[in-house]
């Protein structure tokens, strides 16, 4: 069963990993080998969690990369479902002829 409003992984990482360790964003960024800005954007939920960052977090702090990436996927899917009304696409019925591109 999927969550309707799953949390952004950045906020979860901030609350459950960085803050309990008493680390500043600058210190955590140094441990992870990333810029303060890159980590701050993630922790403040302004950018998506990349697989590279998830692996760094796993190696430094323990939460499994797979779990973190599943959180990102759940967040992305829920976000797209919320926006689906804005996407205007007609269902393909199998009847339309698809034109082959002509060589230039």
Each model region followed by its residue ranges:
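Residue-level detection of the helix-turn-helix DNA-binding "recognition helix"
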Residues: 33, 44-46, 73
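DNA-binding alpha-helical recognition surfaces that contact promoter or target DNA
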Residues: 41, 55, 70
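Short, basic-rich loop-to-helix N-cap that marks the start of a DNA-contacting helix
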Residues: 46-59
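Short alpha-helical DNA-recognition segment
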Residues: 22-41
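A short, Lys/Arg-rich alpha-helix, primarily the initiator
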Residues: 1-23, 70
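Short, charged recognition helix plus adjacent turn
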Residues: 69-104
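K/E-rich alpha-helical interaction surfaces of small helical-bundle regulatory domains
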Residues: 59-73
